[in-house]
Amino acid sequence: MKTLKATLFLLFFIHLGFGQKRDVINDQAIQFSIKQKKDTIHFILIDTKLDEIKPVFLFCQGSLPMPLFVKPAKESMWMIGGGITNFDLNEIKKNYHLIVISMPKTPVIVDEKHLNKSYCYIPNENEPDEFDKDYVQADFLENYEARAQKVLQFLRKQKWVDHSKLIVAGHSQGSKVATLIALNNKKVTHLGLFGANPFGRIDQNIRTYRKEAERKEITWQQANEDIEKTYQMYRDAYDNETLRKDPNLLSWKSFSRPLVNDWLQIKIPTYLAYGTNDIAADLCDLVPLFYIQNAKDNLTYKRYLDLEHNFFEINADGTTNYEKAHWQEVMNEFIKWTKK
């Protein structure tokens, strides 16, 4: 009888863990919220039910305050999801619970009238270039990492999560967030980096000015002036008084941290994928040299020829061909790698 009672209790407990009411958005994702004193962290799981136990795949999205879902005035709601709609979601869901965290101080669902042309959330539709002030103050690397760690702590307590594996990956700015998560969380088993800049962020501006001068799009005099202005902007980012007056500099300061130093400290399998026509990731070609110098063999890299930052093909005139996308191929190769 005691054994029967224990079994019934266990079954009841499991039923509660899997059967509680869910906040399902657009029949695509389940929303979760973690309330804190000064912030509420919203995140979504790309599914509508939790009847399978699977490992977590946390995808860290790129920059800018884009909502996870857009609500048009007349048409149906649709998902941005931090860019995951470019992926083969069914392939990912076969193996993992796919998680995406909302940008800080950014609603999960936003009416289309509160988006600018880049699909960024703007509180005032008459000021398309003005982001929410709270978002600007929260837009720094350490905050993104701290929020993600809270989400991972929550997920570790869920009965529908398989803890044998934890995949963390990010694209562009998200690769920086993913790096810090993996650096500080020993539960992470695989790290994926897409369109990453191994030397941070601000160096890209300087390299851009040089390339423009080399292509004679601007003079070397102009490039010199722009580079010097970039140095000054970065100095300002490290001046506390200037930083208080212009909180936008906080993002430049935190995200310009070189990643390659962190990567060399990470011992878990690391996957680096980038397009050869991506100026942000230009210097990824140097990364294997650092691993060789440090006798490290945990890096797998994939160089995608003639693709740009978001893995689209490039036309002969250098413009992006949005009809020829390769994100599904890129992500599926990564998923295959995580299963080896």
Predicted features by range, described:
Residues 307-340:
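Catalytic active-site module of serine/aspartate enzymes centered on a nucleophile-bearing elbow/loop
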Residues 151-210:
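Primarily recognizes the serine-hydrolase "nucleophile elbow" in alpha/beta-hydrolase
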Residues 20-55:
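N-terminal cap/lid segment of alpha/beta-hydrolase-fold proteins
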Residues 119-134, 141, 192-264:
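Accessory cap/linker subdomain of secreted extracellular hydrolases
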Residues 266, 272-274:
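Short beta-strand/loop motif that positions the catalytic acidic residue
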Residues 279-286:
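Conserved alpha/beta-hydrolase "acid-adjacent" motif
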Residues 112-158:
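Alpha/beta-hydrolase active-site loop
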Residues 50-95, 100, 106-112:
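Short, surface-exposed "cap/lid" segments of acyl-processing enzymes
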